Amino acid sequence: MIRNLSENVMIPIAGLIISAILCYELITMVMDKNNMHEVGSEFFFRYLVKACVAVMLLSKTFDITMAIFDVGNHIVTNAAGVISGSASIDVETTLTGMFNSQLSTMGIGELIGLGIETMIVSLCMKIMSVLITVVLYGRMIEIYLYISVAPVPFATLSNREWGSIGNNYIKGLCALAFQGFFIMVCVGIYSALVASIAVAGNLHTALWSVAAYTVILCFSLFKTGSLAKSVLNAH
């Protein structure tokens, strides 16, 4: 669907933009060459090369955008292998083991307090899970939106004045691709933090630590987009 939108809806618009840019380039070149009085053969050759490059970029727009995300996917896949091998933890297993070892030593009052804390933390975790899901699906939708309009900014790359539009668009694409890497790093840090809970001797501390680390993870995921754009200077 995204490719059909890009090729059937946006490419005709991009074709009009390229036509307007090439006409503007021709008029500018003629004016710079004293109204055709100082025009040589290299003038037409340079103009023809620029037009061919612009059309070729437009025809390969979808392939170029997908190649950028293929590179990003390769980076994320390699990062996932490194992170999963060095920082893997099962939160449920860790907390269950702590509960089984400490519940028998607690009184009624402590159990009631622990039950209330558990319900509060469980509610917070569900809210954080929803927010994390929003971040991940929001990034996926943003990628689809970026790809669907790719021909329009690519059509401006051949012009010196309008080329900044296409350059910023490509930077934004690279930022989206590298955002996945930052997300994996955040998850790896979260796993390392949660792994430290295994040595905690207090259930109350463990519960609130998991909640705090999940809040940190959620906040970090929200910041990955702006961080990726700032690293690549995308606007």
For each predicted feature, which ranges?
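Binding/recognition "hotspot" determinant
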Residues: 1-17
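Juxtamembrane "helix exit" motif at the C-terminal ends of alpha-helical transmembrane segments
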Residues: 15, 19-31, 183-198
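Hydrophobic transmembrane alpha-helix segments characteristic of membrane transport
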Residues: 17-55, 149-163
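Non-cytosolic segments of integral membrane proteins
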Residues: 51-149, 183-232
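Alpha-helical transmembrane segments
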Residues: 154-171, 199, 230-231
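Transmembrane helix-bundle signature of multi-pass membrane transporters/permeases
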Residues: 169-177, 215, 219
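Hydrophobic alpha-helical membrane segments
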Residues: 176-184
